[in-house]
Amino acid sequence: CAGTIGRINHEIFSLQHTEILELEEPFFMGKVGSSTMPHKRNPAVLENVLALCRNVRSIAPSIVESMVSENERDWGCFLSEWEAIPRACHMFGAALQKSKYILENLIVYEKHMERNLNAQKGLMMSECVMMHLARKLGRLTAHEIVYKSCMKAYEQEVPLKQILMQTPEVTQAFTEEEVDLMLNPHSYIGLAPEFVDRVVAKWENI
């Protein structure tokens, strides 16, 4: 459990980096991130949760060690568990409480997500283009064509669409509108909405 909660919070922590900033822990006016740099909005609560979860996980080895005991009653094991288990529960309880606060008040930056999706100027959608082209030219041929197009777009620092529209195999197979659709991240989310609905429905029934 401490691993799962830790990972969730670490993901939010990573996505709060200034250059990414897709998510942010709850913020309110008056919350100070630094005594010397007034602009800072540090992930203090997230850091607290990560430390708590790390400490809980560090207790696991001592509890595992208690599995080896002398016959049926080994007070050396009992005393170790009496100290380790309550300490782990207290810290994990605090981690859960803080995580609940974070998730219920999480700040989501949709515009930043959109910006990050388009940061590579379409390269992220190369799989979608390749899979569509594979239906017409075969998987290996399509992969080679899209690979070369991507490397050219990367090296020239231009949008992938610009290179694709200069590639005969692509323009013979698709219209410009179809290429635009394939390069649109919103059209390539698969079953993600269904998975989200399933998880939410399961949670509501708990």
Residue ranges and their predicted role:
Residues 1-57:
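Acidic, glycine-rich loop-and-beta core segments that form the ion-binding/anion-interacting portion
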Residues 35-206:
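Catalytic-core signal marking the mid-to-C-terminal active-site face
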